[in-house]
Amino acid sequence: MALNELTLREAADKLATKEISSVELTQACLDQIAKHNPTINAFVTVDAEKALAAAQAADARIAAGNGAPLTGIPIAHKDIFNTTDMRTTCSSRMLENFIPPFDATITTHLRQAGAVILGKTNLDEFAMGSSTETSYFGASRNPWDTQRTPGGSSGGSSAAIAANMAICATGTDTGGSIRQPASLTNLTGLKPTYGRCSRYGIIAFASSLDQAGPMTRTAEDAAMLLNVMVSYDPKDSTSIQSPAPDFTQALTGDVKGLKIGIAAEYFGDGLNDEVRAAIETAQQQYQAMGAELVPISLPNSGYAIPTYYIISPAECSSNLARYDGVKFGYRCEEPKDIRDLYFRSRSEGFGDEVKRRIMLGTYVLSSGYYDAYYRKAQQARRLIADEFKAAFEKVDLILTPTSPTTAFKFGEKDDPVQMYLSDIYTINVNLAGLPGISVPCGFDSKGLPIGMQLIGRPLDEETLLRSADAYQRQTDWHKRRVHLG
């Protein structure tokens, strides 16, 4: 196996025993990027010089006996996390040349752990999309089939790992943006409990929904990366003051007696038959491992899409009001007056999908419509959260499909509503603030990956990771790799 195809655990073990060096590992990833990024378009920015310097520093740290599990590991960083030494674009013309004055808290954690940041990965503009097609820098391509999307908004991160350009990656998840791309590219993607990972220095889309998380090849890798990402941060007013365990200690391989909820609402019309079959096989495997399947009902799940597409645009319209061409970001040429500056800078700097959501958000917050839309959406959100809370009195976790289909072709979902529906199974998790993980569970007849989603109680990432890891010990779906040549 090539160095750049190693799991995070395998790479960390080889680095710790000095079987390989971080410079060798980093160079293998950089070589793969140079060879395949022109086609895959996973990275928006790559800084090979800085990456190799960080790798040399990591090797020195390991040689001195000061290494940690992430020391020397080449990682792809979603281009929504602030980095002082690299531009942070959010894949938008608005921030095309923006270099932040401070690092995101998670960026700081990665640096302190000795991780090697290879570069910044592509995403849907300001994380608004499910395919990376809204990126100002063009769509990323799925290494399993380059005519198809790697998902979104964290599609650059998922494509980078699937194409063996990085050992692991960071992502953010507002309505499924870690889990859906993980499902479409045969990866493990974890969206933690809201507030687990600091949002400080992450460019905001919808502040009550955004959450950072790991994208990796295995559940064990996700636990290792999550250990570095989770912390209480006083700079983030929504950060949870809860002790962070060593998530790798939860990986016992045992799910005997675990009660897994199966909600009929997640298996209705619109679910691809091959995806349904793969999920049902995974259910049977959990039963064979000693878990108990418990039928549950989540009838308010049907309100997920309309609720999300009222709340998230409302928050987006507020968050993106700061981009006006005055202080930072894109500025139109020769504005006639302040109104012209605002109007043209925002019209030229934002893409169509971002403008669509800003307008929708402004509308639902406007006088006369606030009560009719926004207030009702918040009430629906509470009903959805309460429904999950009641379900978790009967079960330990809930098993669903991650996405209703496998990876779709570019341009196939040109109707915005069709694109929005690709997150139908993931959005509720964000609305309720719960942790969720997508795990590889099969392939369709076209050879495209299928993912299943596990949903857990608040702050119980340990049960999710234990269950995902136990499944991966019994299956080999996650071990399958793309070989681009």
Swiss-Prot record:
Disulphide bond pairs: none
Pfam families: Amidase
Region annotation Disordered: where it falls in the sequence: 138-157
Biased composition (Polar residues): 138-150
GO-annotated cellular components: glutamyl-tRNA(Gln) amidotransferase complex
Organism: Magnetococcus marinus (strain ATCC BAA-1437 / JCM 17883 / MC-1)
Keywords: ATP-binding, Ligase, Nucleotide-binding, Protein biosynthesis
Enzyme Commission identifier(s): 6.3.5.7
GO biological process, one term: translation
Subunit structure: Heterotrimer of A, B and C subunits.
Catalytic activities: L-glutamyl-tRNA(Gln) + L-glutamine + ATP + H2O = L-glutaminyl-tRNA(Gln) + L-glutamate + ADP + phosphate + H(+)
EC primary class: ligase
Active-site positions on this chain: K78 (charge relay system), S153 (charge relay system), S177 (acyl-ester intermediate)
UniProt family annotation: Belongs to the amidase family. GatA subfamily.
Xref: InterPro entries: Amidase, Amidase_CS, Amidase_dom, AS_sf, GatA
Lineage top rank: taxon: Bacteria
Name of the protein described by the UniProt record: Glutamyl-tRNA(Gln) amidotransferase subunit A
Gene label: gatA
Molecular function (Gene Ontology), one example: glutaminyl-tRNA synthase (glutamine-hydrolyzing) activity
Purpose: Allows the formation of correctly charged Gln-tRNA(Gln) through the transamidation of misacylated Glu-tRNA(Gln) in organisms which lack glutaminyl-tRNA synthetase. The reaction takes place in the presence of glutamine and ATP through an activated gamma-phospho-Glu-tRNA(Gln).
Extent of the signal sequence: none
